[in-house]
A protein has these predicted regions:
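ATP-dependent carboxylate activation and anion-phosphoryl transfer catalytic cores
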Residues: 12, 269-362
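Short hydrophobic/aromatic-enriched beta-strand-loop microsegments
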Residues: 117-121, 146, 236
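Active-site nucleotide/adenylate-binding loops and adjacent lid/helix of ATP-dependent enzymes
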Residues: 1-4, 8, 14-17, 83-88, ...
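A glycine- and small-aliphatic-rich helix-loop capping segment at beta-alpha/alpha-beta transitions
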Residues: 109-118, 194-199, 329-332
Length: 362
């Protein structure tokens, strides 16, 4: 759904857009009729939508490369045209991919090897922010307050579960949240109200990662999100508040339940809102982010305490998602936001290229 909204905005901004989808078995397909594909909402990407395509880890052969034999046999296209059998020129990539392989540094690493500019954070920042454990270690190093947690390794849990439970029970105050360290969209997250629910919650979390985090529920705190935009001098949007209709903001609440409320701007006084923006920018910089990120925090209006929960380097991006809605409330339209992100991709690529050239001359 994010891809459909971004595709429409890029076209309206005057960009020539090549649309690449990924099938469930991991094959990349150049979608030949994206207008038709996106017309009726979400659809599964299948190989029948277009020819197989590739991005090569070779800066001497940038762009999207297509298998000419596959074109000829499956789609009845004349492969005597060298443009079709070779590479299609690409100026920049907008990787609208959430979760594993999309915002964990994997696709970013491939794009770095290819030499193509791309929207969003680089390989290191993407991988750091995807792993909540690593991100919190870095944020704490810089003195940025985070939600406290206990880490559980899957191999330890498999070898000695009783010992792990005994160690945990002495230091936990329920309710707690159990979550995979490196997963998105609240997949594998459980709210646990007592010791009897820990085993099931840990098993669910370990379906998505080899590390699980256990965090105390932040009762009395508001769930606040802040959108960050920029590279070296990032700006923060007005903060927004999430009021889920469910017990917590799980996968269904994010993507299915229409009763979840987004309050923009959040019900915070001006000083507290500015503090949220300041901490969000600090978190963005500390983890080395660029382009965009949504920083999720917990705020206690009475004590004025602020704790960073996590940083999302490729947040949801439909017209009604929190990230673009926060910028809309801050005075930037959806199309201007998308165009700005493309500009930031070129800016980051130019800065990285100059730094590389300076080093090679030494």
């Amino acid at each position: 759904m994010s891809a459909r909204s971004i595709f429409k905005a890029l076209v309206n901004c005057g960009f020539d857009v090549l649309t690449v989808g990924i099938t469930k078995d991991g094959r990349w397909t150049l979608i030949q009729n994206p207008d038709t594909f996106f017309a009726d909402g979400w659809k599964e990407v299948t190989q029948e939508l277009g020819p197989l395509c590739y991005i090569l880890p070779d800066p001497c052969r940038p762009g999207i490369w297509i298998d000419g034999h596959e074109l000829e046999e499956a789609h009845n296209i004349d492969c005597s045209n060298p443009v079709i059998t070779g590479g299609l020129d690409v100026d920049a990539v907008f990787p609208v991919l959430h979760g594993s392989f999309g915002e964990d540094g994997t696709i970013q690493g491939l794009l770095d090897l290819s030499g193509l500019p791309y929207v969003g954070s680089g390989t290191l920042a993407s991988s750091v922010c995807m792993d909540k454990d690593t991100a919190k270690i870095i944020l704490s190093h810089y003195g940025i307050p985070c939600v406290p947690y206990v880490r559980v390794e899957r191999y330890e849990w498999r070898q000695k579960p009783i010992q792990v439970l005994e160690d945990l029970s002495s230091g936990l105050t329920f309710p707690v949240f159990v979550k995979p360290s490196g997963s998105g969209s609240s997949l594998g997250v459980s709210k646990v109200k007592g010791e009897e629910g820990l085993c099931r919650a840990l098993e669910d979390a370990f379906l998505y990662d080899t590390k699980a985090l256990i965090e105390p529920a932040q009762e009395g705190y508001l769930e606040i999100e802040c959108a960050i935009l920029g590279n070296n001098e990032p700006k923060a949007s007005v903060p927004g508040q999430i009021v889920p209709s469910r017990e917590f903001y799980d996968y269904e609440a994010k993507y299915i339940d229409e009763n979840t409320r987004l309050i923009i701007p959040a019900a915070l006084d001006d000083d507290l809102a500015e503090s949220v923006k300041k901490i969000s920018i600090e978190a963005f910089k500390a983890t080395g982010c660029s382009g965009l990120a949504r920083v999720d925090v917990f705020v206690n209006p009475r004590s004025r305490d602020i704790k960073v929960s996590e940083i999302n380097t490729m947040p949801g991006f439909t017209e009604v998602s929190m990230y673009p809605k926060l910028w809309e409330a801050s005075g930037m339209s959806y199309e201007d936001l998308v165009a700005t992100l493309v500009d930031l991709a070129f800016e980051r690529k130019t800065a990285c290229h100059r730094a590389f050239r300076r080093v090679t001359k030494m």
